[in-house]
Amino acid sequence: MADQKIRIRLKAFDHRLIDRSASEIVETAKRTGAQVRGPIPLPTKIERYTILVSPHADKDARDQYETRTHKRVLDIVDPNDKTVDALMKLELAAGVDVQIKLT
């Protein structure tokens, strides 16, 4: 697998969960002898929602909610077969979305 790179993108609503998952991936990759770049934090996407509290006339009574989507990128340079097998067997938290791209 010479001159190949695995790019892993992580997304989660909880920053502690995504940092814990990223450290597990880095630890697993380094244990198998691969070189790791990252985790690189990407900008947090903040979505805000404003909802009218009153069912009828009061436009002044509103509640505001927001969701924050945290993102991280990891690059694993020159992975070997042991690295790929270890990453496939790795169990991450349920709240983390993982996208893996092999280039």
Curated annotation (Swiss-Prot):
GO terms for molecular function: structural constituent of ribosome; tRNA binding. The lineage of its organism: Bacteria, Pseudomonadati, Pseudomonadota, Gammaproteobacteria, Lysobacterales. NCBIfam families: PRK00596.1 (NF001861), rpsJ_bact (TIGR01049). This is Small ribosomal subunit protein uS10. GO terms for cellular component: ribonucleoprotein complex; ribosome. Keywords: Ribonucleoprotein, Ribosomal protein. It comes from Xanthomonas campestris pv. campestris (strain B100). One of its GO terms (biological process) is translation. It comes from the Bacteria. Part of the 30S ribosomal subunit. Coiled coil: none annotated. Pfam families: Ribosomal_S10. Involved in the binding of tRNA to the ribosomes. Belongs to the universal ribosomal protein uS10 family.
